[in-house]
């Protein structure tokens, strides 16, 4: 999830091209479990990117909702590549607990800026935590390493967004650069994980 000013700059143009380019890359790969759902997640991500080109509360909530749907689609795709329950592993259970703590902290930070954002941010953060845990539960031969890297980078990117928006007053070029870099890398890794899994099944 990324936030930028509503202007045609190399950065905003790059964001607009990112998801369509990755969708084409995925479409050119052999069809595999979850690939159609990932394409749906990419569509929601693209809608979120466009919404977050503005800085109003309405645009932020629209972007948040789009990325929430994207993460739900990613969860569904990852579950199709897993043969174990998400919470079967103690490490994943500990991560979910830690993610819940981070979600609470982010919601409290959001409430300092705008109390109406607290609940949506909490729900979004919990969903993001579930997405990362689902990636960790993917079978190793189904692209788990790259999928987990992508999901983890998504968590880093969105945490940086929270820090920038709710703690740094929506300022900080280095933070914004970190958001954009980790976000692009996250989406790329997820596509490569899906492609790696499809090659192993071929």
State where each predicted segment sits.
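Short amphipathic, positively biased membrane-proximal segments
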Residues: 1-202
């Amino acid at each position: 999830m990324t936030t930028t000013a509503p202007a045609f700059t190399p950065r905003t143009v790059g964001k607009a091209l990112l998801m369509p380019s990755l969708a084409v890359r995925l479409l050119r790969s052999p069809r595999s479990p979850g690939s159609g759902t990932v394409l749906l997640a990419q569509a929601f991500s693209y809608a979120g990117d466009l919404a977050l080109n503005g800085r109003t509360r309405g645009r932020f909530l629209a972007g948040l909702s789009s990325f929430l749907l994207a993460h739900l689609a990613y969860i569904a795709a990852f579950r199709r590549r897993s043969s174990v329950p998400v919470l079967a592993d103690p490490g994943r259970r500990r991560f979910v607990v830690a993610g819940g703590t981070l979600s609470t902290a982010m919601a409290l930070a959001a409430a300092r800026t705008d109390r109406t954002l607290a609940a949506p941010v909490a729900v979004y953060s919990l969903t993001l935590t579930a997405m990362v845990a689902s990636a960790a539960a993917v079978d190793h031969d189904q692209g788990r390493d790259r999928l987990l890297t992508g999901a983890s980078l998504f968590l880093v990117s969105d945490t940086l967004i929270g820090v920038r928006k709710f703690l740094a007053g929506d300022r900080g070029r280095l933070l914004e650069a970190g958001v954009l870099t980790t976000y692009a890398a996250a989406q790329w890794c997820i596509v490569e994980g899906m492609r790696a899994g499809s090659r192993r099944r071929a």
